[in-house]
């Protein structure tokens, strides 16, 4: 290059200033840790949160919040649950509904009690009075509520934060006692001796919902032979007919005939009261040749038992289970006898021997069988899981530790042990202490589910369940469940308002006493049960007799607490609906809150407390594992939002990415979350943000009131884009209505990436940047972009609420609404819908995709840089595509709907003679694509290759089109 040429290059005018470049205050980066709190403050200042929903004029919508436990840091389960609720609430707010959402907390129970006790020394614990413990527990729970509340707010959750419900509030406690009283008066509450799930580690009864069932618990299972001392005459005669004659002498018979049982709880053998059989099963009398004994087993299990015991049997007789009733046997550990009785359908041939060791004090089926056969409910185990003196030589042994070993040893010494084997199975554990539980018969308070079971099953049918499988799940649970043990032997809870007569243990629990306690709790709270004596707790009519009565010490199950929320919250606030429109919790709540709420509501009012129930799965790590400290795989939502100590490995994504995750997953099953998933979500978030930024950046000089182009006068490409936007609005609306948020996620991603960025905006760049500012074709595109950005902000607002508001605040022209949430939900205008454009444009887009694939190959081979360096020739064999191109040519705007510009090439030829020099000629399903180097020279302003470059001496490096624009500026 000569000196003169170089000087000429330097003196050329720069055309950058003549282009319409992006201008927007909407940042490329979200800067979420700063910007999101700013937007939340904006909402709070303007009353644009739940206040907006309450001010709406539409129909009411109440999502009743299932109360999280007021203990511990927020985790991904909280995030999944609360964000799902918030997405639904925000959608209803945008639809103009009067939305009610009162956040709640479950504040009573053992975990909080234990947390308080852990802060005290042994001396302080011993000196602690019940009321002191309650005060400390209440303070602890209140502190936890405050911390969790701030976390929920940071996630962008809207709710009535100024008036949440807490199960420790006096108005809640009072309403719960009222509900309890209504169940008492209907005859559904009773006190009885019954085996319940008992936690020795917590020293209290547990409800089914308070249990976990780890898979790998190992129990010592034993096969035991009980010595028979008496046979019913009819059975003896039947055996003789089959050739089996047994001794009539009791001692000799006991040596010869054995009843064989199998149990995984050897520690319950001291409480054995019977052996149960199934009346419909066949049983075999088999000879143990080595010992000369006759053993009784279920016929179907003979082969399995023979293999396990390593003994060869010879069948010598058989009998129906019904005929075994009345056999008497000696207890192998004590000097007492017990009968064989008929049990229920729970006795099967799935495992064991078909004869079931029955201890009514240690099992529900055993208890029921005991009632039918007048068996004693014997339970020689105390609240710590220690054998009492009633267990004889086993007194003082822990039933879950050393008792099994000692009992098995005693069985072996007595000659009763046939086999001991470890048995791995599911076993109930205390969900709080993570330690095994037992069945233990104690005096407890129960809700008689049997009294309203059929009503509950009918109520389930009247509810809409999402997914539908939830209906069968809760129906089977309610159908099969026993009575509900509602009493707990702890201090931190709502007391069961009962009085016992000191001498007789007579129970005092009637409308007068319950009403009095209800009123006291409403005035003072439940603490007065411990602060007042009986003279004040009893109604005035009984105060003079208070010295004869003693108040109870049991508290209510926390599931009764939370299951009363419909009565304590929904029915106490006039604005809230009962039944609620929606309950939404994890799938584990079919046996928890959904069920406890259902049972209390049906018992009192005969219907469910909800119209619709939606359930979600659990949050797992990326490998599908449950999160735990031991695995080191816990994902902390706070770290997702604010970042970790190392921002490179744990960047601050902000609340919207967390919310986007919730919308991206199929929440009806367990859902994964991890660093790789977050990176992918961040990319999607960034794509939506950058697409929005591009739209905003091209509107800096646009005023819809002055510059809009009438929709009927828009080019075909713009009309198609509005039609596609209308389709997306309708599809996303339907997805939200059906709570299919992952469908929203897919539609949003496709709309921003495929429809906008890769197609419409890619084509629009030329007219946006290169045209004169007021060029009609640019104004047409800006008209469409303005319409889209306003709709897009509304569509993403339930999920990406912060981004939606940020977009709204950065729209450069005047809007009549100060917030996107005041605009309301986007609707698709009828004049946007032009179905006739869908098929031809789809065919052309398909062709464009094929062309881009061939151009990309040229770029990869370094034959081309920009696609504008290419010329394109097409041979099209598909008539539908030819018709589409012809439709565009005849009906389109020549300046915008020129198909050459849609392919972003400098020349286009359809059909005609092949070009002499080509880079590639490639067949595809619709014809042939031929790529060559573009003819002409590159325009320095628009970068198109044209043959009229240099025709204007004033602008020798510009094409004719750009010269025209420059002359207008």
Swiss-Prot record:
<feature type="binding site">
    <location>
        <position position="585"/>
    </location>
    <ligand>
        <name>L-isoleucyl-5'-AMP</name>
    </ligand>
</feature>
<dbReference type="InterPro" id="IPR009008">
    <property type="entry name" value="Val/Leu/Ile-tRNA-synth_edit"/>
</dbReference>
<dbReference type="InterPro" id="IPR002301">
    <property type="entry name" value="Ile-tRNA-ligase"/>
</dbReference>
<keyword id="KW-0479">Metal-binding</keyword>
<feature type="binding site">
    <location>
        <position position="959"/>
    </location>
    <ligand>
        <name>Zn(2+)</name>
    </ligand>
</feature>
<keyword id="KW-0030">Aminoacyl-tRNA synthetase</keyword>
<feature type="binding site">
    <location>
        <position position="962"/>
    </location>
    <ligand>
        <name>Zn(2+)</name>
    </ligand>
</feature>
<dbReference type="GO" id="GO:0005737">
    <property type="term" value="C:cytoplasm"/>
</dbReference>
<comment type="similarity">
    <text>Belongs to the class-I aminoacyl-tRNA synthetase family. IleS type 1 subfamily.</text>
</comment>
<dbReference type="GO" id="GO:0006428">
    <property type="term" value="P:isoleucyl-tRNA aminoacylation"/>
</dbReference>
<dbReference type="GO" id="GO:0004822">
    <property type="term" value="F:isoleucine-tRNA ligase activity"/>
</dbReference>
<comment type="function">
    <text>Catalyzes the attachment of isoleucine to tRNA(Ile). As IleRS can inadvertently accommodate and process structurally similar amino acids such as valine, to avoid such errors it has two additional distinct tRNA(Ile)-dependent editing activities. One activity is designated as 'pretransfer' editing and involves the hydrolysis of activated Val-AMP. The other activity is designated 'posttransfer' editing and involves deacylation of mischarged Val-tRNA(Ile).</text>
</comment>
<keyword id="KW-0067">ATP-binding</keyword>
<feature type="short sequence motif" description="'HIGH' region">
    <location>
        <begin position="68"/>
        <end position="78"/>
    </location>
</feature>
<dbReference type="Pfam" id="PF00133">
    <property type="entry name" value="tRNA-synt_1"/>
</dbReference>
<feature type="short sequence motif" description="'KMSKS' region">
    <location>
        <begin position="626"/>
        <end position="630"/>
    </location>
</feature>
<dbReference type="InterPro" id="IPR009080">
    <property type="entry name" value="tRNAsynth_Ia_anticodon-bd"/>
</dbReference>
<protein>
    <recommendedName>
        <fullName>Isoleucine--tRNA ligase</fullName>
        <ecNumber>6.1.1.5</ecNumber>
    </recommendedName>
</protein>
<dbReference type="InterPro" id="IPR050081">
    <property type="entry name" value="Ile-tRNA_ligase"/>
</dbReference>
<dbReference type="InterPro" id="IPR013155">
    <property type="entry name" value="M/V/L/I-tRNA-synth_anticd-bd"/>
</dbReference>
<keyword id="KW-0963">Cytoplasm</keyword>
<keyword id="KW-0862">Zinc</keyword>
<dbReference type="GO" id="GO:0000049">
    <property type="term" value="F:tRNA binding"/>
</dbReference>
<dbReference type="InterPro" id="IPR023585">
    <property type="entry name" value="Ile-tRNA-ligase_type1"/>
</dbReference>
<keyword id="KW-0547">Nucleotide-binding</keyword>
<dbReference type="InterPro" id="IPR002300">
    <property type="entry name" value="aa-tRNA-synth_Ia"/>
</dbReference>
<dbReference type="InterPro" id="IPR033708">
    <property type="entry name" value="Anticodon_Ile_BEm"/>
</dbReference>
<dbReference type="InterPro" id="IPR010663">
    <property type="entry name" value="Znf_FPG/IleRS"/>
</dbReference>
<dbReference type="Pfam" id="PF06827">
    <property type="entry name" value="zf-FPG_IleRS"/>
</dbReference>
<dbReference type="InterPro" id="IPR001412">
    <property type="entry name" value="aa-tRNA-synth_I_CS"/>
</dbReference>
<feature type="binding site">
    <location>
        <position position="939"/>
    </location>
    <ligand>
        <name>Zn(2+)</name>
    </ligand>
</feature>
<dbReference type="Pfam" id="PF08264">
    <property type="entry name" value="Anticodon_1"/>
</dbReference>
<feature type="binding site">
    <location>
        <position position="629"/>
    </location>
    <ligand>
        <name>ATP</name>
    </ligand>
</feature>
<dbReference type="InterPro" id="IPR014729">
    <property type="entry name" value="Rossmann-like_a/b/a_fold"/>
</dbReference>
<keyword id="KW-0648">Protein biosynthesis</keyword>
<feature type="binding site">
    <location>
        <position position="942"/>
    </location>
    <ligand>
        <name>Zn(2+)</name>
    </ligand>
</feature>
<dbReference type="GO" id="GO:0008270">
    <property type="term" value="F:zinc ion binding"/>
</dbReference>
<dbReference type="GO" id="GO:0005524">
    <property type="term" value="F:ATP binding"/>
</dbReference>
<dbReference type="GO" id="GO:0002161">
    <property type="term" value="F:aminoacyl-tRNA deacylase activity"/>
</dbReference>
<comment type="subunit">
    <text>Monomer.</text>
</comment>
<keyword id="KW-0436">Ligase</keyword>
